Amino acid sequence: MIQKITSHIFHLCRGQVFQIEGYRIFAMGGAESHDKARRKEGVSWWREELPTEAEVQRARAALECVNWKVDIVLTHSLSTKIQWELFHGMLSYTENRLTDFFQELDENLDFRLWFSGHYHFSKQFDERHVLLYDTIVQLTEGGFRKCFPVEK
C-alpha cells in the first residue's frame, strides 16, 4: 500500500515490495528509539515503532513473491552487523529483533542499493549501503548520484 502525503511525498508501507519508475523497491520502516526514556508515550514515542512479528512475516512473504530479489531497499535502521561496525557497540544503538531481521535480509536478499536514515548523518558505508540524513539522491542506471544537501 502507498499512502499519498502530498503531491510529491508518498509513504511506502512496511514490508511491501513496490514497482516504481522501473525499480523494484522493498520498504520496511521502523527503528528502536535509543532515547525513549526522555520521550512521552503517544506524543514523542510509540510502541509501534518496531514492526510486529506479523509485519515481519508479511515482509518475508512479499520477498518470496519476488524470489528475494529487489533493486532498492528502503529502511530506517540497518542490520545488526553494520550498526555494530558503524558505532562499535555504543549502547545507544543496540541489537533488536528488527536489526536482526535486517541482518537476515543483508545475508539473503539480492539487492543493488540499501538506503537508511535513522542515524542522522549521511555516509556511503560501502558500495551497497547508504545512510541518508540531509542529502537527496537520484537513482541512476549505475547506482545513484547526490543531488543536493537539504538546506536547514
PLM-predicted stretches and their roles:
Residues 4-9, 65-71, 104-113:
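A structural motif corresponding to the C-terminal end of an alpha-helix
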Residues 80-151:
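Conserved beta-sheet core of the metallophosphoesterase superfamily
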Residues 3, 14-21, 124-126:
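Short acidic-hydrophobic surface loop/beta-edge motif
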